[in-house]
Amino acid sequence: MLYDAIKKLVQYGINTGITPESERIYTTNLLLDLFHEDNYEDVDCDLNNLVLEDILAELLDIAAERGIIENSIGYRDLFDTKLMNTLMPRPSQIQQTFWEKYKVSPETATDYYYKLSQDSDYIRRYRIARDRKWTVDTEYGTLDITINLSKPEKDPKAIAAAGKAKSSSYPKCQLCMENEGYAGRLDHPARENHRIIPITIQDNPWGFQYSPYVYYNEHCIVFNGQHVPMKIDRNAFEKLFDFIKLFPHYFLGSNADLPIVGGSILSHDHFQGGNYTFAMAKAPIIEHFTVKGYEDVTAGIVKWPLSVIRLQSKEVKPLIDLAEHILNTWRSYTDEDAFIFAETDGTPHNTITPIARKRGDLYELDLTLRNNITTEEHPLGVYHPHAKLHHIKKENIGLIEVMGLAVLPARLKGEMELLKDYILTGKDIRSNEQIAKHADWVDEFLPNYSSITEDNVEEILQQEVGKVFCEVLEDAGVYKCDEKGLEAFHRFVGVL
């Protein structure tokens, strides 16, 4: 019943604080208009225990029945964002509240904004809850594993319709300021319920927002107000620490700026951060070293599957000075014995994935050494997950994975369910096209378990997936965690 569902949605807005009580009638009228409805009756309905997902589902069903939208996930997602926007304050009101709360403390401001980003359904809590998450203990610490199920699968109708639609270059990408309030298209998400907090980084306008897919607590994105490409240089380090000074309870890192070792969006300058301590941040330094001329910065090699130098200092400037020196040295560094080539045929290979944070009184910067060289044996990258691990993960190892969180493809959920059944019943895994790619891996680990039962098979699979992710990270490390690898790492440190 339309009136019933509208009343519930408005009440949800009031309960969460995104809609003031004084705007009840105004908001009701905005919603009626979206349903082409001239009438309204204030009906009696149960306003206790309101569940947003259920209210929206009812309203979307009504919109589809009335022919206002096509009944497919793409169109439903565009329309429910429109519905939520009717409950929302204007951007300037949210910005004003944010900075008022910031005067109390940076945490108070981000707590408010994170809750708002969820209450507005920009972060769809009920979808995030579907993600599968677990942890795996390794020699490097406890790694986080997630199978990402919150990104909606594209439905075939929407793909076909998007193919026929006129192509648009507005907004230029999903990280542009122009997304705020944008109604979206089948090939570009609706962002009408999205609100960005403008901040100043290096005297330039930047935006601060949360990721709608929240891979970890308070997963935020900090992005340039201009659509300019990613670049790792001194300026990038300065930008990271400008943000850390604003929000010292958050870390902030950047993807590398080269293909294969970079993230999925290299075309728009941006960083990712949040209020979470990854395994990498907990990893100890295995040996300290001092770089001549930079004696006031503590430096060391981190015990981590990727090759990481950690810098610490009470002051930001000396930290950035040394980071720039390490970056420039690494960019031009070749060590043939360790298969590190700065460039081949004029194509550069060496770059860095940096992560900045504040630890007590110290500013800290982790510099992850990356190289994107390819060979015939490893066409996707020598320091990239090798082919035998592609059944679990073949995508780029970006910032989030570097820090110790696996973001694994949604296909794995169904494949793991099938594998459980095949392992328990002793069926031939190779006979099923969907899971045949996992057969060698299962053959490898099965002998390590004396008994696999319905009670422990899921836990065993989760642990084995975690071990594969650990191997993935080791593949991405330019210096392996063995005697030979450490010797080669020492050679690089020696030239600093």
Go through each PLM region and give its residues.
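Helical scaffold of the NTase/Pol beta-like nucleotidyltransferase catalytic core
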Residues: 192-197, 227-252
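Beta-rich nucleic-acid/ligand-interaction surfaces
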Residues: 259-267, 345-351
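Catalytic or ion-translocation cores adjacent to nucleophile or general acid/base/metal-coordination motifs
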Residues: 244, 248-264, 273-325, 331-334
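Structured alpha-helical segments in the cores of large, soluble enzyme domains
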Residues: 206-211, 236, 240-244, 290-297
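Active-site microenvironments that recognize anionic phosphate/pyrophosphate groups
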Residues: 1-222, 226-229, 303-305, 319-323, ...
